């Protein structure tokens, strides 16, 4: 890292730490003070209203929701209800996830999000997508501070952002610690986080104690981007935390998860939801807690006209390209199943057809709102794949494929949250997998077939996936020691465009490429019980 960049980072930390208020007398000693913590997570640069899929209450429904202008309406209503007693936060994965974000390295998100008047934010695992320099630049362009207790400059070892912020809200001192995903260097392509280093949860106890003893806060909040299962584990192991506000796994917690005196929540994704925590503070004690997951449906919240204008002005130069029709689908394409999705069946088919291999693999991404039946536009393609990566092919033996699936399934369904890693189950084409989610580690896979035939352990198979920039040359989709690896001149976007041109209108994929023998066909969550009442292994207690 250059001396200039190191200086900029050090200055940003110093300035923000200077903003942290000095200790004052504990507020609310005589009369209880009502406070609202409101937050969003995993916006993924979805600036405009979009189709959203709702399933809470037992009925599946698709409705228009979200958009930054609709978020603005909702948060302003809460601010009017509790003037001066609202803290609005963002739990990360904000500047990645759409064409507008990708084409501007996240800059298109800045003005619309600034219009929301956030109090603070943390970086998510995708904030590194444009590199460390851009991460710091975008954080500096937002009007709210960014905090992260475990993100360091790899060379200087100094924190990139302050570890915490103390905000006085309605006379109540609230200490917020930021904690981002320490798995980023392995989870994302290695080049994304070059120049950065990440610490684990061991940094947190000292900071909690510092907030309580030195800063004399009334409330301690842990704002995380490590996913709900790991956030629950943090609540179980850390002392002195009142609320863990989780992001990353896009989970929708309609009821709080309670661990001792700590509440854990997560507010969905894509700007389709806001999470609201109401509580009172008297004599430095938190009481009367209430959680609400607010669905930002179009029929419940109008768009704020001033913020809508900001979004329109931001997107205006890109609209012709965003609106280009590149295909059609007769059925909705969605990414709302932990095990298999209609959208990713299409994408893995497109990669395999473009490369002419026996097997295609697409990552188990969580991002992208639903694509409704009808025209498929360029904007949809960038929601599906918000980064442009070339295709990479190679040869792998059957035993390598089996080891890959054992490892990937354990990353999704491990009973120990610390073993969870990345997104959802990988999405195959030309291959089917049957597994038991509740089986012991290393024995999850029941059957693998390629081209309809049982997997042969020593046979070589041809495989295509997206290149991960910074990986070893012989690694393909996290499979090491691949033979004859080769990067194609074709990227994933063009592969999908060509596939849509040949196969539109798309019909609903047949599915059942990946089947859990001990789970229902649709699994919406890695945490909550299934409709049959059986908990997915990652659900913990």
Segments (PLM) and residue ranges:
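Bacterial N-terminal signal peptides that target proteins for export
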Residues: 2-12
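Bacterial N-terminal signal peptides
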Residues: 10-21
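Acidic, metal/ion-coordinating pockets
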Residues: 27-309, 316, 338-350, 360, ...
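Feature captures C-terminal
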Residues: 31-36, 46, 143-150, 155, ...
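Glycine- and acidic
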Residues: 53-58, 190-192, 330-336, 386-390, ...
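Short amphipathic
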Residues: 290-293, 325-330, 393-395
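Acidic, glycine-rich low-complexity/disordered segments
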Residues: 312-323
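Glycine-rich phosphate/diphosphate-binding loops and the adjacent beta-loop-alpha structural elements
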Residues: 321-342
């Amino acid at each position: 890292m250059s001396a200039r960049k190191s200086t900029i980072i050090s200055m940003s930390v110093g300035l923000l730490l200077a903003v942290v208020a000095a200790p004052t007398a504990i507020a609310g000693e005589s009369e209880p003070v009502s406070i609202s913590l409101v937050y969003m997570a995993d916006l993924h640069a979805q600036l405009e209203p979009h189709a959203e899929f709702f399933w809470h209450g037992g009925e599946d429904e698709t409705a228009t929701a979200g958009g930054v202008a609709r978020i603005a309406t909702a948060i302003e209503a809460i601010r009017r209800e509790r003037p001066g007693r609202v803290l609005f936060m963002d739990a990360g994965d904000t500047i990645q996830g759409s064409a507008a974000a990708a084409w501007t390295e996240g800059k298109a998100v800045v003005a619309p999000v600034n219009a929301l008047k956030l109090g603070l934010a943390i970086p998510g695992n995708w904030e590194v997508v444009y590199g460390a320099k851009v991460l710091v630049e975008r954080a500096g362009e937002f009007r709210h501070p960014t905090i992260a207790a475990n993100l360091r400059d790899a060379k200087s070892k100094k924190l990139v952002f302050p570890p915490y912020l103390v905000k006085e809200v309605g006379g109540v001192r609230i200490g917020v610690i930021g904690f981002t995903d320490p798995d980023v260097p392995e989870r994302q392509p290695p080049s994304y986080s070059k120049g950065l280093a990440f610490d684990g949860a061991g940094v947190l106890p000292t900071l909690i104690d510092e907030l309580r003893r030195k800063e004399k806060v009334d409330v301690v909040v842990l704002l995380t981007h490590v996913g709900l299962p790991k956030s629950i584990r943090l609540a179980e192991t850390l002392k002195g935390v009142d609320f863990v506000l989780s992001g990353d796994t896009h989970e929708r917690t309609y009821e709080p998860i309670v661990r001792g005196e700590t509440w854990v929540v997560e507010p969905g994704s894509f700007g389709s939801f806001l999470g609201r925590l109401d509580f009172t503070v008297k004599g430095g004690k938190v009481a009367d807690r209430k959680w609400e997951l607010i669905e930002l449906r179009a029929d419940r919240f109008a768009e704020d006209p001033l913020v809508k204008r900001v979004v329109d002005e931001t997107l205006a130069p890109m609209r012709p390209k965003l609106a280009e029709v590149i295909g059609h689908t007769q059925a909705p394409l969605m990414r709302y199943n932990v095990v298999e999705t209609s959208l990713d069946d299409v994408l893995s088919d497109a990669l395999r057809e473009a490369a002419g291999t026996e097997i295609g693999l697409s990552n188990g991404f969580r991002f992208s709102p639903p694509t409704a039946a009808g025209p498929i536009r360029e904007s949809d393609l960038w929601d599906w794949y918000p980064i442009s990566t070339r295709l990479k092919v190679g040869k792998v033996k059957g035993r390598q494929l089996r080891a890959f699936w054992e490892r990937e399934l354990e990353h999704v369904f491990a009973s120990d949250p610390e073993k969870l890693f990345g997104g959802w189950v990988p999405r195959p084409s030309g291959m089917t997998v049957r597994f038991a989610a509740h089986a012991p580690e290393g024995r999850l896979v029941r059957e693998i077939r390629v081209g309809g035939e049982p997997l042969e352990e020593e046979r070589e198979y041809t495989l295509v996936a997206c290149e991960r920039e910074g990986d070893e040359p012989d690694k393909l989709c996290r499979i090491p020691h691949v033979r004859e690896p080769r990067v194609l001149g074709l990227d994933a976007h063009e592969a999908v465009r060509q596939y849509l041109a040949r196969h539109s209108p798309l019909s609903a994929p047949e599915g059942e490429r990946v089947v859990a023998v001990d789970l229902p066909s649709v699994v919406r969550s890695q945490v909550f019980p299934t409709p049959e009442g059986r908990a997915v292994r990652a659900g913990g207690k």
